[in-house]
Design a protein with these regions (language model features):
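Glycine/proline-centered hinge or cleavage motifs at structural transition points of membrane proteins
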Residues: 204-206, 218
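Transmembrane alpha-helical segments of polytopic membrane transport and secretion proteins
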Residues: 1-34, 109-115, 287-297
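Membrane-water interface segments at the C-terminal ends of transmembrane alpha-helices
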Residues: 28-59, 75-191, 219, 223, ...
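Glycine-rich helix-loop "coupling/hinge" segments at transmembrane-helix boundaries
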Residues: 57-61, 239-265
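A short amphipathic helical element positioned immediately N-terminal to and/or at the very start
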Residues: 63-72
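Transmembrane helix boundary and interhelical loop/hinge segments in multi-pass membrane proteins
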Residues: 61-64, 142-143, 189-199, 208-210, ...
């Protein structure tokens, strides 16, 4: 009995001794987190820190708030901020309405090729923004297809479609490009909707409008919030559409950054505008997170 007990104690001691080096050799979790954090800091945070630092560095050198005072006092900045906000809000509203209607049709109105259209929405998300703008220029540009058909049919020297070089052209291009970003989460939400609710509502005499308002819309609100917030942030930072439309007098914050940095070589002012743009984007994203958390989305 004593020999057996001694053997058991010896085995336990050997096991504990073998486990001790293994525990001592175990790498803490924070060590594994260092490489990705370092890569993230080097690739993203360091350039942002340089932009912020440059925004406080006037041409004379040193650190000062003068670049912010000069930019905030300029009419070009105020006009760019106003244009950016109203274009972003208008585009987001248009995308929400159009995206909701199109997603409803694709999800609940059976028609040939409906699944192919839903697949195309996924493909559309990968298109660059300038490609959509280029397509609109081919259709509605000064020498586009619509103006060509008009002049060919009427014999006029010029066509009537010249809105692409106005803010309305930018608005149309942004709605065209960003609407699928609203449709995608809506289609995912509609695919999980219990169709028996629609059947029960219809059997109780509810019309299509009431079914949409009472049954479908409440289920779609989280998806609408997600898609709308994404579109709003992307519209605030959109550069390619405004550049490719060549809209006269349409200067957004990203375009102002380009103008200050590339055309005027005023890097301090460009960094100030960039910091403002980043602050607006981060603020909107934080607000979206708070609202979605309270809504339970």
């Amino acid at each position: 009995m004593t020999a057996t007990t001694g053997t058991a104690r010896t085995g336990a001691a050997v096991t504990a001794a073998a486990a001790a080096p293994a525990r001592s050799r175990a790498v803490p979790a924070w060590v594994w987190a260092l490489p990705p954090v370092a890569v993230l800091a080097l690739a993203f945070l360091y350039p942002l820190a340089l932009v912020v630092q440059q925004s406080f560095t006037p041409d004379e050198g040193g650190l000062s708030l003068d670049p912010y005072a000069e930019v905030f006092a300029s009419a070009s900045f105020r006009d760019a901020l106003t244009t950016t906000v109203w274009l972003a809000l208008g585009s987001t509203a248009g995308c929400l309405v159009l995206g909701f209607v199109l997603a409803l049709v694709i999800a609940f109105v059976p028609f040939p090729g409906g699944k192919a259209v839903a697949r195309f929405v996924d493909v559309f998300l990968s298109f660059p923004s300038f490609l959509i703008t280029l397509a609109l220029l081919f259709i509605y540009g000064s020498v586009g297809m619509a103006n060509g058909l008009w002049t060919g049919a009427t014999g006029a020297a010029d066509g009537p479609f010249h809105f692409l070089t106005t803010p309305w052209g930018v608005l149309l291009a942004e709605i065209t490009y960003f609407t699928p970003f609203v449709m995608r989460p809506l289609l995912a939400a509609f695919s999980q909707l219990d169709t028996s609710q629609l059947e029960v509502a219809s059997s109780l005499g509810a019309g299509p409008v009431r079914i949409i308002r009472r049954v479908i819309l409440p289920e779609a609100l989280p998806a609408l919030a997600a898609g709308g917030s994404l579109v709003l942030v992307m519209c605030l930072n959109e550069f390619g559409i405004v550049l490719f439309t060549g809209a006269k007098g349409v200067t957004t914050l990203p375009m102002l950054v380009y103008s200050k940095a590339i055309l005027e070589s005023d890097y301090a002012a460009a960094c100030v505008v960039a910091v403002v743009n980043i602050a607006i984007s981060v603020g909107l994203y934080s607000l979206y997170r708070v609202v979605s958390r309270r809504a339970g989305a």
